[in-house]
Amino acid sequence: MSAHYATEPAPTASATLHTTFGPLHIALFAKQTPLTCRNFLQHCMDNYYAGTIFHRVVPDFIIQGGDPTGTGSGGTSIYEYPEFEYDPDARDPNEKVVLRDEIHSRLRFNRRGLVGMAKSEDGSYGSQFFITLANTERELNGQCTLFGRLEGDSLYNMLKIAEAERIEGTERPVYPVKITSCEVGDLGPFVDKVKKRQVVATGPKTEEKPAAKKKKKAKPGKALLSFGGDDEEDEDMPIRPAKPKFNPMLVTDTKLPEKESSTKGEASQTRKRPRSPSPKRQPQPSAPPKNRPKTPEPTKQLPLPNPESPERSPSPPPKQSFLSRTNAEIENLKASMRRTAHAPAAETKPKSALEAMIPQTAIRGRKRPPPGSVSASTSAPNGITGFSSNSAEAEALKMFNAFRAKLESSDSQPTAAAAKRLSVAKTDAAEERKETPDEDEESQLCDLHFIANCQSCKSWDNDVEGGANNGADDDVNDSGWLNHQLRFGKDTLGKDLNWKREHQDVDTLMVIDPREKEKELADSSRPGTKRVKGRGLERDRERERKKGRVGDLEWSKR
């Protein structure tokens, strides 16, 4: 990005377009493109773009707007107005200003967020502009004028506009983004040239019908003096008769001459009729009265209805549509296919209000009579036996004494029958081992660990190890396990300090110092020293003595 700023010139003017998706801050290259920037700034100053939309969205290319008509074919430049046709600061003040291409070598469409002027088919520019969404050097360089760039967070608002949903097959968005207002920031070199005008963006022209002119009432004609040359004109003009000089309401009805009556009839058409008493209207024949139902008199007896006469229905039955009739037939068919025979419901006794409050998952408990009651040892009507606290304590004490007597009478050693059975089982197993030959290793492998003669997978209740099933009852009845005591071997490894405290004279560890052994060997190898006899024997005797105290098993572990 720094390389772009190194090649691009610094912007000298700025403007902001406020849209429904957020503001678009545009920095303008007014020094490199003066005509285009002045056109854009003047439109922003006049609020020309307010109400316009972004009518064209091409993904990964451009978004286009600035057309007051919203069709892509409208919009004009300021140089088409008389006040901007001539520029007094130009080289030739008498030459009309035309908005043409302003191509600059340092302004290139090489990234997104660059603002350019949209060109019409005839090559002229108006008010429409576009914003690039990607690198468009191949399509737009040297073709259109680049006059600005977006700055700040406006890039994110531009991307939101570019994500708009479009009408299928076109480049027009379904819900186009609208420019709500315009704001001019820095005018740069156009401080004294760009001023606000009262110009509003014009939309598409609609043909208005001319308003119909109201017809004016003809004024009464005035009598004009007739001259020789005006005879023909006087014949065409109607002569208005003079107003009668009497009140017709006070004068009796007399016959007027025919000429006077004709003129009077013509005058009545051109002026208002005088007020006259309205003639009396003749009474029109009254319409026959409708047959309205009379309220029956309370004292009059009504006739009984004739059962043979057909009765009229109050309203015709509504006609069912074809769909409703079809659905009704389907429902009837489904109902006929269902099983209509129902199992007879079991008769249930009515529950009282208290029983209805008991949940269905509740378990009926044991009824206990109050302590000291007479019915403690009797049974309840529902079969549950009640008991008192005294009888329950006596029964529990009796069972406890029987169990304690059983413990005292039992022996920890197995009974003679069990010992005999165990010896017989061992002899039988030994005979079977001698008789049955060894099978292949593959047949002796366990299915879980694939180990020959696996003890983990071997059945613990095998007849060979546990004895025959014939003496199973004796094992169940054997009570020698009741007095069995759990005993552990001597802890000579130091896990339990009690054994060390009791046998402090036993040295469980034998320390051999190699330095002492080295000294002994060195002394014995010297020529002038006498070799002490019996020292090795004493060491061996001491080792045997310790070995006897500890035990052969523990000594082998060391």
Swiss-Prot record:
Residues 513-523, 535-558 have a biased composition (Basic and acidic residues). Its EC number is 5.2.1.8. Keywords: Cytoplasm, Isomerase, mRNA processing, mRNA splicing, Nucleus, Rotamase, Spliceosome. Pfam families: Pro_isomerase. Residues 201-388, 408-443, 510-558 are annotated as: Disordered. GO terms for molecular function: peptidyl-prolyl cis-trans isomerase activity. Belongs to the cyclophilin-type PPIase family. CWC27 subfamily. Associated with the spliceosome. This is Peptidyl-prolyl isomerase cwc27.
